[in-house]
């Protein structure tokens, strides 16, 4: 007896998987690959991940490239979805290079921050800081790029 799940059920299951697993599942079949590569899926996966657990946004303060070391100003902004409107706390992470990786490209205006989870695995989320006014968030595991600020995914959050 051959049992097949409807595609919308498969999509719903895939949405709940971590990025690292999705990358592997792109090889299962062409239907899964096209689903995972679709912009609609990428948007839903990101929103679903943020609804399941309180999302963290990485904030990197301005720094001088020569002093790019333990003294870099790095903080996480954690949202608490159990309160309405969202509350948040800011936690400074002094010298915790194992939670993030900052690289300076050949261009002095481009800085890259790679975010790692508590298991020291890359989350796939990368922040490119081109200038003060232009930032791009990308998740290369899902080929996701977004020039909007993270607040686009948090309608209740107002930036000052």
UniProtKB/Swiss-Prot annotation:
Residues 1-44 form the F-box domain. Pfam families: F-box. SMART domains: FBOX. InterPro entries: F-box-like_dom_sf, F-box_dom, SCF_F-box_component. This is F-box protein At1g15015.
